A protein has these predicted regions:
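RNA-contacting regions in translation and RNA-metabolism proteins
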Residues: 1-53, 66-88
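An amphipathic, aromatic/His-enriched active-site/gating alpha helix that lines ligand/cofactor pockets
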Residues: 63
Length: 88
């Protein structure tokens, strides 16, 4: 899998969330992702354009849940824990 020139083996959790958010939204230039290390693991904060918020969250939160599932699976392979926070 290729994430904008970064091989999957070297891609970070931040890169994964950024790739998914830019692919789903209509305004990829307004996607902002930050990663903060906490005691519990990596906290990934995602900020998107207000008009893209519904697309990122999805009906009844299904899209956000799927992104979180992918993030958790990738983090587990890295023996880490990751939490996704979607900011308004």
């Amino acid at each position: 899998m290729e994430l904008e020139g970064v091989s999957a083996g070297g891609a970070s959790l931040k890169d994964l969330v950024e790739f998914l958010a830019k692919s789903l939204g209509n305004h990829p230039e307004e996607v902002s992702v930050t990663e903060v290390e906490t005691e519990e693991g990596s906290l990934i904060q995602l900020k998107v354009a207000q008009s893209d918020l519904g697309r990122i969250i999805g009906r009844q939160g299904r899209t956000a849940k799927a992104i979180r599932a992918l993030l958790s699976a990738c983090a587990a392979r890295m023996k880490k824990r990751a939490i996704l926070e979607i900011l308004e």
